[in-house]
Structure formats: C-alpha cells, structure tokens
Amino acid sequence: SDSIAKQKLDLIVRTGRALGVERNNYSSMSDFVAAMKKAFGEIKVQSGGTGALHALERQLGLDKLGLSIEDVIESAGDGDSNDKVTQALERQTKKAKDETNATGSDQAVEIDSAAANLYGLLSFN
C-alpha cells in the first residue's frame, strides 16, 4: 500500500540522516544509497563503530522492526517492493490494527504511536 511505501522511504531518508547523509544533497536515489553505504562502512570500521550503529538502530526504532541499518540500505538500493523493510512495516501495521481490534480500544496503538512520534518513524494512517 501507499502508506507502506511512504513509511519505507521515510525510514530510508531518516536512516541516511542518522548516518550523516542527507537525501536532498543527492540527485538520485542510487547516489544517496551509495553515500549511505560509504558512511555505514566508515562508521563500522571505527573502534566502537558497531556499538554506535546499534545505538542508531534503536534510535530509529529499527530494533522493534527486527531490522538492521544494513537491511534498510539494501532495501533502498534494491527497489524491490517485497523486501525485508516492506515486510517488517507491513507486519507492524497489521499488528497495530490487530491489537486495536483485539482490545477494542486504541490504547495499544496510542502507546505505539507515542513511541513512533518519539522516533518520528511511522505515521498510522
């Protein structure tokens, strides 16, 4: 669905930003992805780099989605609509809907939504 694609793009752009790479500075998605890969590689080889990347993953809410920064970068470069990121976002969206239906209240979604706002990660439409 559209909103998943939008969430995915948002997540990719925010992941880039977390790596110090701004989407607007690149004329094409592939240039942007290449810059993300480069930044990721540079952080990874630094001492404490892996820890820093895990911290970014938590900050971006990727851990809750069961994704790594590498997954996001791969998904950005892939353009395949059925990649790991899309599947994770679909699961999360479905889970939020199921929880709402199950409890008959929006409480579960509200908690998720508060966390999401914290990360600015997902928009529940």
Where are the language model's segments positioned?
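Type III/flagellar secretion export determinants
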Residues: S1-N125
